[in-house]
Amino acid sequence: ALWKGGEVDLQLCADETHRRLGKEGYTIRTSEGKTVLEAATEQGLLYATYHLLRLQAEGADCTRLDIQEKPAFDIRVLNHWDNLDGTIERGYAGRSLWKWEDLTDSVSARYREYARANASVGINGTVLNNVNASPEILSSDYLQKVRKLADVFRPYGIKVYLSVNFASPMKLGGLSTADPLDEEVARWWKEKVQEIYGLIPDFGGFLVKANSEGQPGPCDYGRTHAEGANMLAEALKPYGGIVMWRAFVYSPSDADRAKQAYLEFQPLDGRFRDNVMVQVKNGPIDFQPREP
């Protein structure tokens, strides 16, 4: 959309008000016929701009504005269930947006439109691939392709995250185990994380589905979900990355699926590192955040 109103002034501000609003907060005010957008960062100004355009589209009176905004949630992320072969698990609207086979040589203009659309509603992160992850997403060839997407998304304040297979050290690194307490395994992850941040300095982190529906995980080695998540969190911590560890865990050995997440995670309360988030589904199974 194009702005059809009067003069607009965008300003970066380091005053107390904008420090309090954080790096994504902003103010919009009108003064003497001019609209002033102020924020502590360029990302805040981006969101302020979209807010102003949204008001215009709604037909609001934009001549007397006095707005302060601060996001209620720091991480506002999309989880794509896209596979590397272009299929989408539970996908009902065609194939994947990501043309991995083309990203070696070209970058589709659709990726910029994707970033613009998501930034306009405040999305600031995207997990590119299915939680039932192929280890290949962490190969050097694929990371180069991920870098190209990250470069397109960055101006719109969108960080890239990856779903990872917990057995990647075995599949890609040739190790004999993926035990999170094994020193070689931890070293492999630290080196892989270092490689990722060398390509994508603002990489968001990992999403992990472990020990659920046949996916590998720390429980295969007698370790807890916390021990598995914390090993990855330690590798990501120096770079500001996070781990999103899914709580959707169940196996066919117990008929009562609804209690399994509680039984596995409640004893681990307080044992996860501060850059680990336990991610639940907004559904009737994981701790019943929403009843059917």
Stretches with model-predicted labels:
Residues 17-207, 237:
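Feature activates predominantly on carbohydrate-active enzymes
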Residues 1-4, 57-60, 153-157, 230-243, ...:
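Structural alpha-beta junctions
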Residues 7-9, 159, 207, 242:
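Residues at or immediately flanking beta-strands
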Residues 2-13:
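Short acidic low-complexity segments
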Residues 148, 174-292:
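Catalytic-core regions of glycoside hydrolase
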Residues 12-17, 38-42, 82, 247-249, ...:
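Structural motif
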Residues 1, 22, 26, 37, ...:
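Domain-scale selection of a single, long terminal region
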Residues 15-22, 258-262:
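Charged, often glycine-rich, active-site loop that binds/positions anionic groups
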